[in-house]
Amino acid sequence: MNRNCIKFLLIFLFFSFSTKAQEKFSNPIIPGGYPDPSICKVGDTFYIVNSSFEYFPGLPIHKSKDLINWELIGYGLHRKSQVNSTVNLIDVQSNGGIHAPTIRHKDGIYYIITTNVYYDEEREKADMVNFIITAKNPAGPWSDPIHIQGAPGIDPDLFFDDDGRVWYVGNQMPENPNFEGEGEIWLQELDINEFKLIGGKHL
């Protein structure tokens, strides 16, 4: 009886250590500068996109099956024609550029929605352009940026509701802030075919 218990214990310890050895991974999982991650899962694959600020190509996209091993598969902004008009990365400042993207998938289409920040030094003001790009393959090619007119603030997100409607969710500065840097969350329905805000805004 004792011999069987010892055998069982040894087998248990062997598999425990083997499992722990397989669970080891490096931190950070994706080394380098990949802040503000947004992730979505399609089938058995995870896709992640990050801020890229003033760098081009921009919006790096990685994929993974296990959330540990990641492969860079492309960039949302990969053509110069994407960044010289609505989105300006030609002479953008080092504290501007692409901030806090969101990646989503619906009905075979991938969406990235994000903010381009451009500081106008003459006016001492930051211009913020919220825009969407789309692709049928997350590795690209991605569409030209589509400016979401009437969408103030930063950190945009997309919510696909069960009733078929799509909502734009954003963060903006309130009209009468209680403290410096205060933000408020707002949402508004988005026509996902025309990429236009419709209906009223909800705070």
Kindly give the residue locations of the regions a language model identified.
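Bacterial Sec-dependent N-terminal signal peptides
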Residues: 1-23
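Carbohydrate-active catalytic/glycan-binding domains of CAZyme proteins
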Residues: 21-203
